[in-house]
Amino acid sequence: DVARWLQPDWVIDTARAEGLRVLIGFDFAMGYPAGFAARLTGEARAEAVWRWLAGAITDTDNRNNRFEVATRINATFPEGPGPFWSHPTGQSWPGLPFRRAGIDYAALGLSETRVAETAVPRAKSPWMLFNPGSVGSQSLLGLPMIHRLSQIPGVAVWPFAAPDSPVVLAEVYPSLLAGPV
């Protein structure tokens, strides 16, 4: 049943029950540029951001509060607009810029991209929440799930934990592959 393979809990339970080792890939940023975790949570660890977002994001009935949460995070940066930006045309989110223009990441004490994105010139910033190619919304909504799954015994999130657990969760970038897999 294909639908089951799209449910990480089922994959993890099945792998553990059958003694399998499994790698589960997620196509969104599992972290933010250096300095963000400490600024948001007081802890310089990606896991602290996952935990914080798990307490802030609501995502039920195909509705979520990602733009509200991004606006709330942006409000903790009095040095200027950002770091998050972009939202649907016609919507107003005070404190969440529509465009990247005017965001001074250096003044915020952050970088626009992670080290991982510097290796892929066409990669979008994890701060970009909306429009083609953006991954910011996927990260805001996916990281609470990563937090929940990381609490299951036998699950590790690489590279934040050693990949020697039976189930390893990792960030993947499928569009880097040119041909069929």
Name each model feature, range by range.
Residues 2-23, 28-181:
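RNase H-like (RuvC/DEDD) metal-dependent nuclease/polynucleotide-processing core
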